[in-house]
Amino acid sequence: HPDLDGLSAEDFERIFRLNVVGPFQMVRACAAALKSSQGAIVNVSSVASVLGTGSSVAYAASKAALETMSFSLARSLAPEVRVNVVAPGHTRTPWHESARGAAGAAEVEKRYSSIAPLRAISESADVADAIVWLIEGARRVTGQVVYVDGGMHIATPR
């Protein structure tokens, strides 16, 4: 994501459409079915929502907006539907290695692992496990953000 000086209004709006408007439209389309089945919604945010990563102003802002929208949805869809958020930190995926190259990905992993209290970054399965738990096992949990970031959100100065 470009920094503030290189971020056009069009790019800012595109990122918001993807990360906020898209999930809103999905919830609106599925709300009746979710209510009748006592369903659950898990939106995927990012630790960037609370850390405000400097090189991704629109991304961080859109993920914070997604979390706030999820809190509002948790109130308005209760008691029939639970709404929660999973907020991953840096997560090892094939995309990260392809985008940064093997050496770049290893450097990012080393940097994040040295800061996070658990001294490791997440795997995709860690994020998936949190989502499955919120859908299937967390029957009395709504309006929450579950950080899957090794503690990065408590270790990084804001």
Predicted regions, residues:
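Substrate-binding pocket helix/loop in short-chain dehydrogenase/reductase
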Residues: 2-4, 8-13, 112
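Active-site helix of classical SDR
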Residues: 27, 62
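C-terminal substrate-recognition "lid" of short-chain dehydrogenase/reductases
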Residues: 24, 33, 120-148, 153
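Active-site loop immediately N-terminal to the catalytic Tyr-X3-Lys motif
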Residues: 4-5, 51-57, 119
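Short, small/polar-rich loop/turn modules that mediate ligand/substrate recognition or access, typified
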Residues: 78-82, 141-143
